[in-house]
């Protein structure tokens, strides 16, 4: 059974902190064994579905990593990949202890639906600890272009 490490998130927008986690995943799990899963989160603003699909294609091509958009519960995506013959490992990126507390709580919800889930937490490098998609969106709302240095050019 082949291992597939899945890095899920809304990635709205995908930034250099996310890229740092993807780089770590490739070192740990190996090229060809990782996937980015972009979840459509109803509580987070998304422009439109076609734009999201186009961005995911560009991201996949740029990183040379499969990117899949899903609009189901995360455990359902994991079960789908397991049914395709993969041993799935869920990868969660962390910036700090607050993220760990949040992710631990989210994992409890996921385990209410799927008990046997493998999770790896990867901490980003210190230089990326302050970067978040929500902070980038806030910067951009005040002055478009002000957060460009944090974004991955897709």
Show the residue positions of the predicted features.
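Nucleotidyltransferase catalytic core that binds NTPs
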Residues: 1-154
């Amino acid at each position: 059974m082949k291992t597939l490490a899945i890095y899920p998130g809304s990635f709205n927008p995908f930034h250099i902190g996310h890229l740092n986690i993807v780089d770590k995943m490739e070192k740990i799990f190996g090229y060809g064994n990782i996937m980015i899963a972009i979840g459509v989160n109803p509580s987070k603003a998304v422009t439109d579905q076609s734009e999201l699909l186009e961005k995911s294609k560009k991201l996949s091509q740029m990183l040379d990593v499969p990117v899949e958009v899903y609009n189901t519960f995360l455990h359902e995506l994991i079960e789908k990949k397991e049914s395709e013959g993969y041993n799935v490992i869920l990868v969660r990126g962390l910036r700090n202890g607050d993220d760990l507390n949040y992710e631990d709580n989210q994992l409890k919800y996921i385990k209410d639906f799927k008990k046997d889930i493998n999770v790896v937490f990867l901490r980003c490098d210190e230089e990326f600890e302050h970067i978040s998609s929500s902070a980038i969106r806030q910067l951009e709302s005040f002055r478009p272009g002000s957060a460009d240095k944090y974004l991955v050019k897709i």
